[in-house]
Amino acid sequence: MASFLHNFLLFFCSLSLIILTSSATKSQTHVPIRPNKLVLKVQKDRATNLHVVQIHKRTPLVQFPFVIDLTGRFLSVNCENQYTSSTYKAPVCHSSQCARANSHTCRTCSSSKTRPGCHTNACGLLTTNPVTQQSAQGELAEDVLKIPSTQGSSPGPMVTYPHFLFACAPSNILQKGLPKNVQGVAGLGHSPISLPYQLASHFGFPPKFAVCLTSSPGKNGAVFFGEGPYFMKPGIDVSRQLTYAPFTIGQQGEYYINVQSFKINNAMLPSIPKGGFGGAMISTTTPYTTLQTPIFRALNQLFMNQLRGVPHVKPVAPFGACFDANRIPTSKMGPTVPSIDLVLDNKKNIMWRIFGANAMIQPRPGVMCLAFVDGGMRPKAPIVIGTQQLEDNLLQFDLMNSRLGFSSSLLFRRTNCANFNFGTSSTNTDP
C-alpha cells in the first residue's frame, strides 16, 4: 500500500510539473514582442536605378515590392491588381483615421461593386508617382502589415501592425517610370502616416529611421526604423561617428539640408549667393544629383580645373564633364579623383564628403563622367541630392529633433550598405 501511494505521488508530481512547464512555455511564446528597431531589405533595380523595398501585407500575408521615396507622405498601393485581404478596411469619411491622415475629402466610387480602393464615403488622399509627378486621388485604407524586428545585427521575429494606414492608388499612376512589378511607393517623408511615423508610434520607439542604399544591383541594402546601433559585416556599427546637420521640411514632407557651397581640393565654388545655395533636397527617386544650371556649370568647371592631367572627352548625356577612364586609377574609394565637399556649415567645418565611387559614373566603356546633371534654371530645388551620391552612405533621420546624421562613404570604413546580415528572419509574430 505504501509503495502504491509512493508511486501515485510521484506520478502526480511529475504530471503537475509537465503541465506547469507546458503552461509556462505556452505563455512565453505568446508574450507580445515590443521591438525597439525594425529593418527592411532594399534592392537596387538595374533598369531604373531606383531602390525597391520588400513589405509584407494583407491577410493571408503576401510580400510585395515598393519603390522607396524620401519625399512620399505614405505607403501608396496598387489595389486594382487583385488585392485580396480579409482584413482590409476603408475608414469612413471624417473618422479619426482620416483626421490622422490629414484627409478632408470624401470620395465616391463610381463602380456598383465595392472592392479595395473603391468604397463610397471613404477618405480621399492625393497619390503621386514620384518619377513622373502624375497625381490622382486614392482611397485611405488600413490593413495588416508585418515587418522584421532587429537588434541591429540581423533580422529577428516578424512583428505585426494590425491597422496600418495607407493609400489605395489608381494603377495607371503607379506604372510609368517605376520598376517592373512594383506594387506602389513606400513613403518615408515627414507625414503622420508615413512608414517611419506610424511604426514609431505603434511600437513605441523614437521616431528615427536610417537609409543605407547599396550600389550593387542584386544585393540587399537596408532601411532601419528606430535608434542604432546598425551593424554591417564585419561587426561595424555604422551609426557611430556620424556627422550631424539640421534639416528642414518642405510643403510635401521632403527633407532639405542647407548647402552653403561646394569645395574641391579646398577650392571653394565661386559666385556663391549670399547665405549659400539654400535648401538641398534629399531624394531616393532622383538617380543623380541635379543642380540649377549656374551651379552645375560652376561645379563642372571647378572639377575639371582640379582633375589635372586627365584628358577630357565628349560628354555623354546627361552629364557635362567626362574624361578618359583609362587615365583614372581606382582605389577602395572608387575612381581616384578629387573629393567633392558639400559645405553645410563653413564656420563649424561641417561637410559631407563625396568620394570617387559616388562622384563618378561610367556611362560607357572608356568614358568616366562627373555624376551631376543640369536641372535647368527653375528646378524644384537648387540642389537635389540623388541616389548615386547616397549609395553606400548611411543617412539617419531624427524626426523629433529635425537632425540628419550622415556617415559619408562606408567604403572608407571597409564596409558598405550590402553588408547587413539579413540571413533568414523568423516567421514568429506578435499579436
UniProtKB/Swiss-Prot annotation:
It is found in: Secreted, Extracellular space. Keywords: Allergen, Disulfide bond, IgE-binding protein, Secreted, Signal. GO terms for cellular component: extracellular region. Gene3D superfamilies: Acid Proteases. Residues 1-24 form the signal peptide. GO terms for molecular function: aspartic-type endopeptidase activity; IgE binding. Disulfide bonds join C79-C168, C93-C106, C98-C123, C109-C118, C322-C369. Its main location: secreted. It comes from the Eukaryota. The keyword ATP-binding does not apply. CDD domains: xylanase_inhibitor_I_like. Belongs to the peptidase A1 family. This is Gamma conglutin 1. It comes from Prunus dulcis (Almond). The lineage of its organism: Eukaryota, Viridiplantae, Streptophyta, Embryophyta, Tracheophyta.
